[in-house]
UniProtKB/Swiss-Prot annotation:
Record EC number: 2.3.1.274
UniProt GO MF annotations: phosphate:acyl-[acyl carrier protein] acyltransferase activity
Chain's gene name: plsX
Domain of life according to the entry: Bacteria
Physiological role: Catalyzes the reversible formation of acyl-phosphate (acyl-PO(4)) from acyl-[acyl-carrier-protein] (acyl-ACP). This enzyme utilizes acyl-ACP as fatty acyl donor, but not acyl-CoA.
Subcellular location: Cytoplasm
UniProtKB keywords: Cytoplasm, Lipid biosynthesis, Lipid metabolism, Phospholipid biosynthesis, Phospholipid metabolism, Transferase
Major location category of this protein: cytoplasm
Pfam families, alphabetized: FA_synthesis
The organism of origin for this protein: Endomicrobium trichonymphae
Catalytic activity, as annotated: a fatty acyl-[ACP] + phosphate = an acyl phosphate + holo-[ACP]
Matching Gene3D superfamilies: Isopropylmalate Dehydrogenase
HAMAP family in the record: PlsX (MF_00019)
Record protein name field: Phosphate acyltransferase
Amino acid sequence: MIIALDAMGGDFAPASTVEGAIFAAKESKHKILLVGIEKILVGELLKYRGRYDLKSLNIEIINATEFITMDEHPAKAVRQKKDSSLSVCARLVADGKADAFVSMGNSGAAMSAALFYLKRIEGVLRPAISTVFPNFGGHCIIADMGANVDCTPEYLLQFGIMASLFCEKVASVENPRVGLVSIGEESTKGNELTLAAFELLKKADINFIGNVEGRDIPGGKVDVAICDGFVGNVILKLGEGLTEMMLKLIRKEFKQHPMTWASLPFLWLAIKDLRKRVDYSEFGGAPLLGVEGVCIIGHGSSNGKAVKNAIFAGAETAKHNIAAGIKEAILRYNNKVV
């Protein structure tokens, strides 16, 4: 696979993105197109010449004269900065020169670039950022995670169809359980949006199990959780905060109780495994479902490991040709209800 990486996007770019590209190139056969200001990227790569044989790595620098910052207006920046690293990445996919593009930068701009250059899949109303959230049984897919803070019932319906397909094909979950995030399990619970979406999801050709509450997501009751982007982003950020709090509390308790220190070598293995299960860098990035092509949006504070895994996520998503499956599923539903 050929993956275009927005090397200028992210809080720690280009250091983190170049490091991630090197990690990905060393651990796979994927070709990495490092897109950004050439002079800067060459300088970053040369920092690794003592540790790696750079000539053996399948990395190519694609020059872009501009980049989009985190605080710029997404759509405006994409329209005005046509030679930004992000725009160049999206065009590489649109022109068939890359199988996917990955960005750790301005998520709104990444979505705008995908819509502008890749276009929406026929029949899709709005694309959704579909992220992996750890739970008791393994992982849950949440859609939407922030692309659409205001939604219609029809948007949520399509999020369910797209995320269910992604969960089945890419995450290899057979007949994934799809739940609608609400304030109670009963079908009568919720607001106008969720009540209307509930009725639509019942008619979809997916394994819709009804309403689920926030606690059901980490509890492992569902494989796919559907919500608007406002709720999804709150869930994600709350989960990150709770994880950090729990790990800090564990460290604090150990410091306050010296008698437990003898067990630390044994408990550390469990804590290490726990941290790995909930660490966002293990998942890399979230696919933008609903566009003609593969766009992976990563965390702004991603390190090299997260960038590497986002590249792998892009390659895996591209391998399964999710866009074609989504188009077929949306068309099948539309024909069913006509």
